Curated annotation (Swiss-Prot):
The keyword rRNA-binding applies. The lineage of its organism: Bacteria, Pseudomonadati, Thermodesulfobacteriota, Desulfovibrionia, Desulfovibrionales. PANTHER family: LARGE RIBOSOMAL SUBUNIT PROTEIN UL2M (PTHR13691:SF5), RIBOSOMAL PROTEIN L2 (PTHR13691). One of its GO terms (biological process) is cytoplasmic translation. PROSITE patterns: RIBOSOMAL_L2. Residues 26-45, 224-276 are annotated as: Disordered. GO terms for cellular component: large ribosomal subunit. NCBIfam families: rplB_bact (TIGR01171). Part of the 50S ribosomal subunit. Forms a bridge to the 30S subunit in the 70S ribosome. This is Large ribosomal subunit protein uL2. Residues 259-276 have a biased composition (Basic residues). Keywords: Ribonucleoprotein, Ribosomal protein, RNA-binding, rRNA-binding. One of the primary rRNA binding proteins. Required for association of the 30S and 50S subunits to form the 70S ribosome, for tRNA binding and peptide bond formation. It has been suggested to have peptidyltransferase activity; this is somewhat controversial. Makes several contacts with the 16S rRNA in the 70S ribosome.
Length: 276
């Protein structure tokens, strides 16, 4: 999981760093666990842009990941740790004792040959999955369900984890990576440990082209646009926009609260991120 710095043979490589990929044990995916991935370019079903600055990028195969960990009581051996172009984390190929194969997010410290299992009476070790009711207070977890049986939705990116800080009745209190403390039902499943590939945050792309390989297009400033395209656009020569910074839809963009005060999940948030 080390980061390798390239020799400055060109301006684009001068500050470029890449992963060493030393934990990768196989370069090709399990074909039965892949499917085609059609590019959306940030468009929704009506063809309208809903996520700006998306498009292009290298062709990818989607790896089908088991976020639910619903194969209870069946031990699985980690056959390979692989690269996944669709996420920042590495993925681990599991060979279950009954012959089935599945991908999971590769936790920190889990390597080829290790055995992991999901269930309510399993050891507290990285890679094992269980309900939050079975996890001791103080343990760090990842791939956390928000609704029982739906599959993990929290803490899936490289290096992320949440800490179980308390249990109150039917709820477990988790400290999220943002610092937010929120309630989650104790019947929700989580995987022990931290997501691997910690050095992902230290990667420097070095040049614009590397962002384009990932399907990320340039970000144009509002003040550089025409008045029809942005509230800050227009003016003679270079202008400051003439008003406080706003989004293309006129919503203040620096410090303005956008969360719905009537949102149902607000009662499950004990401490907002950034609060003392």
């Amino acid at each position: 999981m080390a980061v390798r710095k390239l020799k400055p043979t060109s301006p684009g490589r001068r500050f470029q760093t890449v992963s060493s990929f030393e934990e990768i044990t196989r370069s090709t995916p399990e074909r039965s666990l892949t499917e085609g991935l059609t590019k959306k370019s940030g468009r929704n079903c009506y063809g309208r842009v809903t996520s700006r600055r998306r498009g292009g990028g290298h062709k990818r195969l989607y790896r089908i990941i088991d976020f639910r960990r619903d194969k209870v009581g069946v031990p699985a051996k980690v056959a390979h740790v692989e690269y996944d172009p669709n996420r920042s984390a590495r993925i681990a190929l599991l060979h279950y004792s009954d012959g089935e194969k599945r991908y999971i997010l590769a936790p920190l410290g889990v390597k080829q040959g290790d055995v992991v299992v999901a269930g309510d009476s399993v050891d507290i070790k990285p890679g094992n999955a269980m309900a939050l009711s079975r996890v001791p207070v103080g343990t760090i977890v990842h791939n956390i369900e928000l609704y029982p049986g739906k599959g993990g939705q929290f803490c899936r990116a490289a290096g992320t984890y949440a800490q179980l800080v308390a249990k109150e009745g039917n709820y477990a209190l988790l400290r999220m990576p943002s610092g937010e403390v929120r309630k989650v039902l104790v019947t929700c499943c989580a995987t022990i440990g931290q997501v691997g590939n910690l050095d992902h945050e230290k990667i420097s792309y070095g040049k614009a082209g590397r962002s384009r390989w990932l399907g990320r297009r340039p970000k144009v400033r509002g003040v550089a646009m025409n008045p029809i395209d942005h509230p800050l656009g227009g003016g003679e020569g270079r202008s400051s926009g003439g008003r406080h910074p706003v989004t293309p839809w006129g919503i203040p963009t620096k410090g303005f609260k956008t969360r719905d005060k009537k949102k149902a999940s607000s009662k499950l948030i004990i401490k907002r991120r950034g609060q003392k």
